[in-house]
C-alpha cells in the first residue's frame, strides 16, 4: 500500500483510508468482533488511516476502535486517526449543528476518551453551523492543535469560499467531501481549492454507496437502511437506471481482472495526488478486494473508457434527500 501526505505537514497515511461509519449500524448490524477483524485486516493490508466521528452510532464507532487499541497492545501507534465533532444530539435523537468553542472542546475530549488516546492526527468540524463565522471556528480548532490534542484540523462538506476563509486563519490539513464516479461535485471547486492550499481531499462514499460495487443494493435492501431509504438515487425509477448503467462498469472491471470497487478506488486515486478515499465495509473480504485499487495503474485509454461508460451526471437522483441536505454547503 502506497502512502500519501496528509496536509501541509506531511504526515504519511495510506493512499486508501478506512471509513468508520460502518463500525456503527449505519449499513446493517455490526458487532465489536466484526469491527476488530476489519481493523486487523486493514493493518495487514497496509491501511493505517481510520476516519470516524461521534455521530457514527453516537460514539459507538469510536468506542469500538478504542476497545481495539486496548485489546491489541501497540496497535494505536500503527494508525493515523481522524474524528469529527460539531453535531449535537438531543434527548430524543434530534440533531443540530453546534460549532461553539465550548461544545467542540467537550466533543473532542469525549472522543479522545472513547478512542482511548491522548491525541488524534486530524479533527474535523463535521457540519458547519451556518450562523457562526468560519474564521471563529477555525480559531477554535487551532487552539486544539496548540494544546497538543490534535495535530491537524479539517472541515467536512464545506464550500470552496468557506475553505478559502478558513485557510487564511490556520493551515487546513484536510477537507472531506463525497467524491466518486457517481458524485463529481468536488470537481467544480473544492478539488481545485484543496490543491491550492495543499490540503488533502478525503473522499467519503467513494463507491457510490454500493452503486460502484459488484453487488449494488437493490430496492429491498436500500429500504432497510436509514441512510438510503429516502436517498433519491436509491428510489425507483432512479435505482433501476443507476444499476443498469453501472453494469457496463462492472463488466469493464471484470475484464481487467479486478472488482468494481477496486476500479472505482483506482479511478479516484488517479484524479489527484492529494486525494485519499475512505471506503467503509463490514467485510474483510470486501476490504481486501477494494484495496487492490491502490495497485492499479489506469492507462489513458482506460480512463477514457470509464468516462464513456459513466459520463459526468450519469446518476439519476440527487446524492442526498431534502433532509440530508441540511448542513452540507452547496456551491456552483
Q: What are the residue ranges of the model-derived segments?
A:
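Glycine/proline-rich, positively charged
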Residues: 91-182, 189, 200
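Aromatic-lined glycan-binding groove of carbohydrate-active enzymes
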Residues: 186-224, 259
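Structural preference for beta-strand elements that scaffold enzyme active sites
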Residues: 13-17, 48-49, 78-82, 119-122, ...
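N-terminal binding-site loop/beta-alpha segment at the start of enzyme catalytic domains
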Residues: 1-79
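Conserved, mostly hydrophobic/aromatic
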Residues: 6, 18, 35, 50, ...
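N-terminal small/glycine-rich loop or linker at the start of catalytic domains
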Residues: 8-27, 82-96, 119, 124
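Active-site beta-loop-alpha junctions enriched in small/polar residues
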Residues: 21-23, 53-55, 84-88, 125-128, ...
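Terminal-tail/helix-coil boundary detector
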Residues: 1, 196, 224-251, 255, ...
Amino acid at each position: 500500500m502506497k502512502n500519501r501526505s496528509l496536509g501541509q505537514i506531511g504526515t504519511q497515511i495510506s493512499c486508501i483510508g478506512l471509513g468508520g461509519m460502518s463500525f456503527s449500524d449505519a449499513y446493517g448490524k455490526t458487532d465489536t468482533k466484526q469491527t476488530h477483524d476489519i481493523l486487523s485486516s486493514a493493518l495487514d493490508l497496509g491501511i493505517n488511516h481510520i476516519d470516524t466521528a461521534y455521530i457514527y452510532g453516537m460514539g459507538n464507532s469510536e468506542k469500538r476502535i478504542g476497545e481495539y487499541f486496548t485489546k491489541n497492545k501497540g496497535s494505536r501507534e500503527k494508525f493515523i486517526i481522524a474524528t469529527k465533532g460539531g453535531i449535537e444530539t438531543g434527548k430524543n435523537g434530534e440533531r443540530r449543528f453546534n460549532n461553539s468553542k465550548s461544545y467542540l472542546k467537550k466533543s473532542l475530549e469525549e472522543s479522545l476518551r472513547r478512542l482511548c488516546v491522548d491525541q488524534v492526527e486530524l479533527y474535523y468540524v463535521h457540519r458547519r453551523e451556518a450562523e457562526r463565522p468560519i474564521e471563529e471556528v477555525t480559531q477554535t480548532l487551532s487552539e486544539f492543535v496548540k494544546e497538543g490534542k490534535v495535530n491537524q484540523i479539517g472541515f467536512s462538506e464545506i464550500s470552496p469560499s468557506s475553505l478559502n476563509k478558513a485557510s487564511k486563519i490556520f493551515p487546513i490539513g484536510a477537507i472531506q467531501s463525497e467524491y466518486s464516479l457517481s458524485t463529481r461535485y468536488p470537481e467544480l471547486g473544492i478539488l481545485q481549492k484543496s490543491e491550492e492550499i495543499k490540503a488533502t481531499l478525503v473522499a467519503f462514499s467513494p463507491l457510490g454507496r454500493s452503486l460502484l460495487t459488484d453487488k449494488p443494493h437493490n430496492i429491498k435492501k436500500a429500504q432497510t437502511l436509514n441512510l438510503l431509504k429516502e436517498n433519491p438515487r436509491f428510489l425507483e425509477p432512479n435505482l433501476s437506471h443507476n444499476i443498469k448503467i453501472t453494469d457496463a462498469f462492472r463488466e469493464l472491471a471484470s475484464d481487467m481482472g479486478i472488482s468494481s470497487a477496486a476500479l472505482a478506488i483506482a479511478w479516484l486515486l488517479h484524479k489527484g495526488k492529494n486525494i485519499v478515499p475512505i471506503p467503509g465495509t463490514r467485510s474483510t473480504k470486501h476490504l481486501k478486494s477494494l484495496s487492490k485499487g491502490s495497485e492499479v495503474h489506469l492507462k489513458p485509454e482506460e480512463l477514457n473508457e470509464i468516462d464513456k461508460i459513466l459520463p459526468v451526471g450519469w446518476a439519476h437522483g440527487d446524492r442526498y434527500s431534502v433532509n440530508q441536505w441540511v448542513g452540507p454547503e452547496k456551491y456552483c
